[in-house]
Amino acid sequence: MFKTLTQNLTKIFDKLVNSGILTENQIDTAMRDVRVALLESDVALPVIKGFIEEVKQKALGQEVIKSVSPGQMIIKIIHEEMINLLASTESTTKLNLNAKPPVNLLIVGLQGGGKTTASGKLALRLKNQNKKVLLVSLDTYRPAAQEQLAIIANSVNIDSLPIVKGEKPLDIVKRAIGEAQISAYDVVIYDTAGRIQIDNVMMEEALAIKKILNPTETLLVIDSMTGQDAVITAKTFSEKLEISGLILSRIDGDTKGGAALSVKYFTQKPIKFLSSGEKLTDLEEFNAERLASRILDMGDIISFVKKAASIVDREEAEKTAIKLKSGKFDLNDYLQQMRSIKKMGGFGSILSMLPGSGKIFDQIDQSKLNSKIIEHQEAIILSMTLKERKNPDIINASRRKRIAAGAGMTVQKVNILLKQYKQISAVMKKTSKMNPKNLLRSGIGKLFS
């Protein structure tokens, strides 16, 4: 989501670091460049003004100008101020479940903003924390909205309240309360009806539901792809419904990212979760320091490790590591790695969490980050014999033609896969001797050139 902002800020930082001793005029110029970068990313003007003033005030201090590395000092100040802009206290960013079960969570937002998917993701997260969860759809207006939530719930073996045709939202709430008590649910998540735009009827209904439920959390789902409209939506919901926190959806989209930097400022409510993609596992706890590091191209290794740990089987990873060191990494291992990468959101998602990624995104053929490529490569490898997977060197021209036909792909795509396999094998053997930045620039980056 922050690709453009990250790239623009990285260019500014490179100038600062390479300048050596900085004058006040150079700092002024850098701050103007930062202001333009934030404006181009749809960050709200009042947010930019306050941010620049804070950074400039600290950056013009004598300790910065006279420091050994003034450029690095300014980057540090920008990083700290961005954390301050995004951060809330830890107690408010954590999901509040402090109530006698069943605990009620109310999910609100505009139609099409990712509210129903976010409800399912949150339910799965709580289920994985050994909570008994019930999902309840209160959207009786959008066709098949209730069925959509039921399908999501069923896909991850979570209970959803049975649908009664023609039942009104407030009646559904009362039935859900009874069911939750009888069946001893720990948490009940209520997915409210959305509207194409905010209206009084929508707000009155949400207020009536909230009054009955007295939820520990009223979470507003904000679509990060809506830009400045996200700020207007957040302000209105915050003022009329007294939300307790925010979930930013579609953060993996190719958008400017300004909404994330603006909504917390205007609502003074904590961002609690970041939602990306359609997979129900794609929900992460918000952490201001890690997001600021990601925006400033410092990487987010902690999130990377956490995501990898939740997806990659440790025993299999250790076996692969041993094979890499011994030089026995074959196409079966390659396939396993590609599947793990796919589960983690694809190459683009992984690169965005590694330090220095912003500098190489311009050098990468973006079409090669497409998740479809992994699916195509999977089809190609599955068209090979076991012998070919274990001994890729035996795959000659006639074998490549047969494999391509079996996978429904071109011979060129088979050639590309085999080339990438060899490149990855070579890169992997060197990883133990390289830090993440060098790996990214000298190794992985070459795979997409």
UniProtKB/Swiss-Prot annotation:
GO molecular function (one): ATP hydrolysis activity
Keywords: Cytoplasm, GTP-binding, Hydrolase, Nucleotide-binding, Ribonucleoprotein, RNA-binding, Signal recognition particle
Main enzyme class: hydrolase
rRNA-binding in keyword set: no
Catalytic activity: GTP + H2O = GDP + phosphate + H(+)
GO biological process terms on file: SRP-dependent cotranslational protein targeting to membrane
PROSITE patterns assigned: SRP54
Domain of life: Bacteria
Protein residues bound to GTP: 109-116, 191-195, 249-252
Subunit-level organization: Part of the signal recognition particle protein translocation system, which is composed of SRP and FtsY. SRP is a ribonucleoprotein composed of Ffh and a 4.5S RNA molecule.
Its job: Involved in targeting and insertion of nascent membrane proteins into the cytoplasmic membrane. Binds to the hydrophobic signal sequence of the ribosome-nascent chain (RNC) as it emerges from the ribosomes. The SRP-RNC complex is then targeted to the cytoplasmic membrane where it interacts with the SRP receptor FtsY. Interaction with FtsY leads to the transfer of the RNC complex to the Sec translocase for insertion into the membrane, the hydrolysis of GTP by both Ffh and FtsY, and the dissociation of the SRP-FtsY complex into the individual components.
Protein family (similarity comment): Belongs to the GTP-binding SRP family. SRP54 subfamily.
Name assigned to this protein: Signal recognition particle protein
Organism listed in the record: Rickettsia prowazekii (strain Madrid E)
Taxonomic path: Bacteria, Pseudomonadati, Pseudomonadota, Alphaproteobacteria, Rickettsiales
